[in-house]
Design a protein with these regions (language model features):
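Conserved NTP-donor binding/palm subdomain of two-metal-ion nucleotidyltransferases/polymerases, i.e.
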Residues: 1-122, 127-250, 308, 313, ...
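Intrinsically disordered, low-complexity regions enriched in glycine and serine
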Residues: 272-277, 323
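Short hydrophobic transmembrane-like helices used for membrane targeting/insertion
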Residues: 248, 257, 278, 298, ...
Length: 445
């Protein structure tokens, strides 16, 4: 890792609040370089929140750069307000047409951030109930020429904001694991479509439960790694998913917790979010209850074993209330369920790599990791993140150009690089791509 990348990571920990002290390495920061990395990784707003917490003597950047950073942060704030409104309006439009929906990632993820308006927004990913045939048919009755792929169909933009209509939240390239993933989504979909929250003071939407997000967003990151590349923004999202998981179970076991403005269903106003002294909102959504439940026993080498010890020690040392003990048991049971799903889906080693990044890069305490960290896989994934940037747009290893042929050659080259670590996905990728070609022919308008 290069020197400025290391300084960037140190400062990122401070920005997200996993460390409280200003990193000493910041004295050697090249702020122009940090800004370039933040742009590459779509973390401009997150870092600017950290800059606002710094004493003036620690901000050694030129005034022009500071003003540019401030302007971009304000643009992100405005964009999030527009995205909030669009997510609400699009959800309501589908509801009136007879479809239940759930907003994936995006503005639902922003609810977990200390300052929801600092997250770099993208498009609207909306999961629409009904299955591929029904949803594709409905969308094309509105806009006949929209293109469909295996998990979503394009949709007319709403006030300039791109919309993707999902009939499957995500997918895996390995046919066997993907079959299990789609069964999981079918099994838990009811909780997702009925899990409604307030999006600031603008309106109400459905977002996934936190336990669902632990699995879904991991598959989303995995898919990006296999197909185009991932950035730190997706990993910061997952950091807050993990934080959110523990907040939910603590609040669920504590009925005295307020469900109003203190919860993650409340967006602070954009003006209040600019103070730089924001507190992470706590979610108060009821955790998902899997129909199948989790394993009744976890082996000693499983993360859940150490986690229960850590949670139990923490509980006995810091609290004597029944609610704290209940929170520990509830979160441990939920982790058992998540671990069982990750093993079934072939995601155990990848999850271990992500946990290594959560601990080493973001400063996540070991007691909050959902599987044991895997250094070998973590270092590989982290290198991919730093090389490729958000959506792989900055990957200098793309040597085949931007044509369709170049894209396919790049995919083969990527598969070769990934097969050592993720053989099932990498070896199935060419097969899936061939199968997907005929799937798209079937659903071509």
């Amino acid at each position: 890792m290069l020197k400025q990348q290391k300084i960037f990571i140190d400062f990122l920990r401070f920005c997200i609040g996993s460390v409280k002290e200003i990193p000493g390495s910041l004295k050697e920061a090249d702020w122009q370089e940090l800004y370039a990395i933040a742009k590459k990784q779509c973390l401009v707003g997150i870092l600017f929140d950290g800059i606002k917490k710094l004493p003036a003597e620690h901000v050694g950047m030129k005034k022009e750069l500071l003003l540019q950073w401030m302007a971009e942060s304000q643009m992100l704030e405005n964009a999030n307000v527009r995205l909030n409104d669009a997510a609400i309006q699009v959800s309501e439009w589908f509801r009136k047409k007879g479809f239940r929906t759930c907003i994936l990632k995006g503005q639902g993820n922003a609810l977990m951030y200390p300052n929801p308006y600092s997250r770099t927004p993208g498009d609207i990913d909306i999961w629409v109930e009904g299955g591929d045939k029904r949803v594709i048919s409905f969308v094309r009755s509105i806009s006949p020429h929209e293109k469909a792929c295996y998990h979503h169909i394009e949709f007319p933009s709403y006030k300039g904001i791109e919309v993707e209509v999902h009939y499957r939240p995500s997918f895996l390239l390995c046919f066997w694991h993907n079959r299990k993933l789609q069964k999981y989504y079918e099994r838990v979909k009811e909780e997702q479509f009925s899990h409604r929250v307030m999006l600031g003071e603008q309106g109400e939407i459905a977002i996934p439960t936190v336990e669902f997000n632990l699995i879904f967003q991991l598959t989303h990151i995995y898919s990006h790694l296999m197909n185009e590349g991932i950035g730190l923004r997706q990993l910061v999202d997952y950091y807050y998913v993990l934080c959110d998981f523990y907040k939910v179970y603590q609040n669920f076991s504590n009925p005295s917790v307020s469900l109003s403005k203190g919860s993650s269903t409340f967006f602070p106003s954009p003006s209040s979010s600019g103070s730089g002294d924001v507190t992470a909102p706590s979610r108060c959504s009821e955790p998902l209850r899997s129909k199948d439940g989790g394993p009744s026993k976890v082996s000693p080498n499983c993360a859940g074993w150490d986690r229960r010890d850590a949670i139990g020690d923490m509980t006995s040392a810091t609290a004597s209330t029944d609610s704290s003990a209940t929170a520990a048991r509830s979160s441990s049971t939920a982790i058992d369920r998540v671990q069982e799903e990750l093993k079934e889906l072939g995601l155990w080693k990848f999850a271990g790599g992500i946990m290594y990044i959560m601990q080493e890069v973001f400063g996540m305490p070991a007691s909050r990791l959902i599987v044991p960290p895997n250094e070998k896989y973590g270092r590989f994934v982290l290198n991919e993140v730093l090389e490729a940037g958000n959506f792989g747009r900055h990957d200098a290893r793309n040597r085949f150009g931007r044509s369709q042929l170049g894209h396919n050659l790049q995919r083969v080259y990527r598969d070769i690089r990934l097969v050592k670590f993720f053989p099932a996905e990498a070896l199935c990728e060419p097969l899936f791509r061939t199968w997907h070609f005929f799937w798209r022919l079937k659903y071509r308008k």
